[in-house]
Amino acid sequence: MTLPLAHAFLEQAKTDYSTFEIIRKISDQPSSQWLHLLQMTLEKAAKAYLAAGNENYDRLRESHRVFRRFARKLPHNKRVRDSLNMNAAELKQHIKNLETLIDDIERLVPGRDNYGPTAEYPWRNSQGGFYTPCQYGFEDIVSALNNSARGRNLLRILNRVLSDESWHIAFGITSPN
């Protein structure tokens, strides 16, 4: 079955998020595993909304770091503001408060400009050896997600992004049927 690009990204983001939720609950799973899934969920969810706004497919493929750019669009959407019971200034501040955590998660992607830590591939340490994601704790991010209002708020926003049909409609993501 083929889908419009925005819907395809959204469906994959939902699947990644479901897997994230399952793995995150398993106490002996390395945090790198579920952080990788969370990063991919944020990326694909943002790309769904950006694709619905007619962003070019090739441009979307150029970067893994798109959720912050997308999140900054939320205060400009009346339906989103209304659903969160916030005015534009409040939502803008709310998103701004999440940006450090969003950036930390988006930096988990390996690439030319990222020499570690990443949630996916080993990276070199200062002594010439390597760290491996499955043995690295990612304590700052894990603590923020598990124990802070920022973490809870980011996951609440992400749940809306993935599941709130009114948000989908507001951004032009329509059902493929």
Model-derived features with residue positions:
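Charged alpha-helical initiation segments
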Residues: M1-M40, Y49-L60
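Long, charged low-complexity segments
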Residues: M1-P4, L50, N54-N177
